[in-house]
Amino acid sequence: MRVAMMTREYPPEVYGGAGVHVTELVAQLRKLCDVDVHCMGAPRDGAYVAHPDPTLRGANAALTMLSADLNMVNNAEAATVVHSHTWYTGLAGHLASLLYGVPHVLTAHSLEPLRPWKAEQLGGGYQVSSWVERTAVEAADAVIAVSSGMRDDVLRTYPALDPDRVHVVRNGIDTTVWYPAEPGPDESVLAELGVDLNRPIVAFVGRITRQKGVAHLVAAAHRFAPDVQLVLCAGAPDTPQIAEEVSSAVQQLAQARTGVFWVREMLPTHKIREILSAATVFVCPSVYEPLGIVNLEAMACATAVVASDVGGIPEVVADGRTGLLVHYDANDTEAYEARLAEAVNSLVADPDRAREYGVAGRERCIEEFSWAHIAEQTLEIYRKVSA
């Protein structure tokens, strides 16, 4: 078996959960079968890199992406199975399946119709990305959803799909990379920021998008207990508009309270690990989240999690055992922000409970979310569609 793994992101250019998923999955699958990685971006060793057509420079981002997909198909002739991730490579997987007569497996890390704010980023290209996703999903031999909640969303959004073709394979976590870590003596990111380790720390790690709910967290932070510090590792804004909105909100928060730290660049793993490990609470305020690898990263670092109850998050964060779930209501976001603050303050006021949640979270990661198991599940789907 030879798998063509199609992805927009691959090391060293990984900025989201789908990229993390592909990176870890490939490492484990290569112990079980042959895998060729087909990705986008800068040239790199160990992968076929597909580039957009240079004559489309300046065109809508969705169109340039599709031209890269065509180049990706051209390099996948040797595959016996193609496996695409997200709409960015869905068309490549679909066309490779048609052109070479091989099965197409598609992992749905999110669904375009459930992310209408993407129209801010893509303009009319949002209609293109939605069409690509529908075409690829409905034609795929198998669709992998990263949570049971995501599987329900897939079947609701694309009712033409045969439910037997939709499988659940959750995201995982490498607990040898994500673990409780003390600040380094010489290169402590917390020391560089000026964070007081003797005061409670609330942390957020993620991109600045509507989906991730950063603005809701910043609004909630006005209600945090006075001694709480907020460390925001938030960058890569989707649009100038949301970048300005979040920047203005953080500035207002910093004027209203002390201990607000904003890291705008994407930090390396060891620095994120340090921040997560030092945090009293990690907050995931997402308004849409098929699973949320970042919650697993925080839990693996033995940190209690406060998260919204959307999508697949309840399949990761065990409410009252590894953290607290907060109900999200799109029609009453002010109440949601108040509930976020209440949950955070309850754990800050009870550090023993926060520590217990953290320990239980790491145990849950080790027992239930190994990448080796995820690779075995994925390989079984390859075998099924190839039979």
UniProtKB/Swiss-Prot annotation:
Family label: Belongs to the glycosyltransferase group 1 family.
Gene3D superfamilies: Glycogen Phosphorylase B
Protein's pathway: Glycan biosynthesis; glycogen biosynthesis
InterPro entries noted in UniProt: Glyco_trans_1, Glyco_trans_4-like_N, M1P_synthase
Superkingdom of origin organism: Bacteria
EC number: 2.4.1.342
Any one Gene Ontology BP term: glycogen biosynthetic process
Broad enzyme group: transferase
Keywords: Carbohydrate metabolism, Glycosyltransferase, Transferase
Miscellaneous comment: Maltose-1-phosphate (M1P) is generated by two alternative routes: the TreS-Pep2 branch and the GlgC-GlgM branch, however it seems that the GlgC-GlgM branch provides most of M1P for the GlgE pathway in M.smegmatis.
Keyword presence, Glycosyltransferase: yes
Changes seen on gene knockout: Cells lacking this gene do not show a discernible effect on alpha-glucan content and do not accumulate ADP-glucose. Combined inactivation of both glgM and glgB completely blocks alpha-glucan production. Combined inactivation of both glgM and ostA accumulates ADP-glucose. In the double mutant treS-glgE, inactivation of the glgM gene fully abolishes maltose 1-phosphate (M1P) production.
Protein name per the record: Alpha-maltose-1-phosphate synthase
Disulphide bond pairs: none
Glycosyltransferase as UniProt keyword: yes
Molecular function per GO: glycosyltransferase activity
Reactions catalysed, as given in the entry: ADP-alpha-D-glucose + alpha-D-glucose 1-phosphate = alpha-maltose 1-phosphate + ADP + H(+)
Function (record text): Involved in the biosynthesis of the maltose-1-phosphate (M1P) building block required for alpha-glucan production by the key enzyme GlgE. Catalyzes the formation of an alpha-1,4 linkage between glucose from ADP-glucose and glucose 1-phosphate (G1P) to yield maltose-1-phosphate (M1P).
Lineage: Bacteria, Bacillati, Actinomycetota, Actinomycetes, Mycobacteriales
